[in-house]
A protein has these predicted regions:
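Donor nucleotide-sugar binding/catalytic pocket of nucleotide-sugar-dependent glycosyltransferases
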Residues: 122-178
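N-terminal pre-catalytic "stem/leader" segment of glycosyltransferase-like enzymes
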Residues: 1-77, 222, 397, 424
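A charged, aromatic-enriched C-terminal amphipathic alpha-helix characteristic of glycosyltransferases
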Residues: 351-359, 369-401
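Conserved donor-binding/catalytic core segment of Leloir-type glycosyltransferases
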Residues: 7, 184-202, 208-211, 223-225
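C-terminal alpha-helical cap of glycosyltransferases
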Residues: 366, 370, 392-424
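Extended catalytic core of nucleotide-activated donor transferases of GT-like folds
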Residues: 7-9, 48-133
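Nucleotide-activated donor-binding/catalytic signature segment of Leloir-type glycosyltransferases, i.e.
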Residues: 234-273, 280-281
Length: 424
């Protein structure tokens, strides 16, 4: 049977959430090279940096990119496109078009996203939250037509909603056999790790403030903030340091510590952060997540998680029966802040979670108290369950199954395989 030509279009070489998503899609396709002839069209992703490490996967990607350029220049076409980007950038590029997106961190998607989704053959999302928001967003409207007899404009009520087949496929775990703890000079024995970009959605300013307010007089507790504004360069670090100093300057007598971590880190180094014995828990008071990859990495590494109890992270912070396996911070759903509005993406009339300050402080304190009394050992067992539930093999298969391209009658392959003999 002829392999299907697949074009993966996405920010596969960038250090970004969508970059990680594109690499997962690529690895899923690569797990079935018996089915797919893979081509790659790399995209930039905002101001985020590009991957710096060179390994066998990077060399393979570079070869595929060169192959793609040559193939397109010679008029090659594709059976399938997998487009890893926000929906308003999806296009009709192949016979079968699959949109793959993180979806949305709020309660509503834009009308353009629904229209673009309905133009796809299938849509794959990273979490059930994103899938549910797509499926539950509806817009009432009218179709206007001119009556040929009266020449009057007639308006017929209609509803814009998602009609395309949609699937939620989570990320897989990553396993490092020789993982050594990341070396960090931490003066405090108990520390939260917060991996978050400086921006409205991650709620980082309040996270830092509420941490300091709760542990103001506790010299044993620290907060490690791994962050950036856009890139991992020196100018960006200086900007982050300035913002951080501005926040902590409001608390001149604090005894707790706040540490800034900045710069390029490999996936392995990020995992090594969580196995440092002084990292007690992961902390995220986010307004919303498509999935929440840093929290996922912490959870399957065996680190307790303190997080907002809403959006994409619930796919892995809750078990398959819905039981919460984390320190769940209460929240209220309210309209997104004005500074977060992004035309065509984050809508002014959409909502996301606003963690309650007292609940956040209470859960942080509860987590530290549990760690001091040895009550967090259960998270190693939970991590083992996550490793099984989200194994690479299972997630790659789920992604390929969601594409649903194995079945069906391939006319071209059938013609190629025909045995035709001349009869005299």
């Amino acid at each position: 049977m002829r392999k299907k030509t697949v074009l993966l279009r996405g920010p596969v070489l960038t250090r970004s959430g969508y970059g990680e998503q594109a690499r997962f899609a690529l690895r899923s396709l690569r797990s079935r090279e018996d089915l797919f002839d893979i081509y790659i069209h790399p995209l930039q992703w905002g101001q985020t940096g590009w991957l710096s490490e060179t390994n066998s996967e990077r060399l393979w990607i570079d070869q595929k990119i060169e192959k793609t350029i040559s193939y397109i220049q010679n008029g090659g076409t594709f059976d399938i496109s997998v487009q890893v980007t926000i929906p308003n950038e999806w296009e009709n590029m192949a016979l079968t078009n699959i949109g793959y997106t993180a979806g949305i961190e709020t309660t509503k998607v834009a009308p353009d996203w629904i229209q673009k989704a309905n133009e796809m053959t299938k849509v794959i999302l990273v979490s059930n939250h994103s899938k549910n928001v797509f499926e539950n967003t509806k817009y009432d409207g009218y179709i206007e037509n001119v009556n040929p007899t009266t020449q009057e404009v007639e308006r017929t009520p209609t509803q814009l909603e998602t009609t395309v087949e949609m699937h939620a496929v989570n990320y897989p775990v990553k396993i490092y056999e020789d993982l050594e703890p990341l070396e960090m000079d931490l003066a405090t024995p108990y520390n939260f790790a917060c991996v978050a970009q400086f921006g409205p959605r991650k709620n980082l300013v309040n996270t830092i403030k509420w941490f300091i307010e709760e542990f103001h007089d506790d010299a044993d507790v620290g907060l490690v903030v791994k962050t950036n504004v856009a890139k991992n360069c020196l100018v960006d670090r200086e900007a982050c340091e300035g913002r951080l100093r501005g926040i902590i300057s409001e608390f001149p007598d604090k005894k707790c510590k706040v540490y800034l971590m900045h710069g390029d880190m490999t996936d392995k180094e990020m995992h090594a952060l969580y196995v440092n014995e002084k990292i007690t828990a992961a902390l995220s008071l986010t307004h919303g997540e498509g999935f929440g990859l840093p929290l996922f990495e912490a959870a399957y590494t065996g680190v307790p998680v303190v997080a907002t109890a809403w959006s994409g992270q619930l796919d892995f912070l809750c078990d398959e029966e819905g039981k919460e396996n984390f320190y769940a911070v209460s929240f209220d759903l309210n309209p997104v802040s004005e500074e977060a509005v992004w035309d065509g993406v984050i809508l002014k009339d959409s909502m996301w979670a606003f963690p309650r300050p007292q609940s956040a402080k209470s859960k942080m304190r509860e987590c530290i108290d549990d760690a001091k009394s040895g009550k967090t050992e259960k998270y190693c067992q939970i991590a083992s369950q996550l490793m099984e539930r989200f194994s690479e093999e299972k997630m790659y298969k789920q992604f390929v199954d969601a594409m649903d391209v194995e079945d069906g009658f391939d006319v071209e392959s059938w013609l190629d395989d025909l045995q035709i003999e001349e009869v005299e």
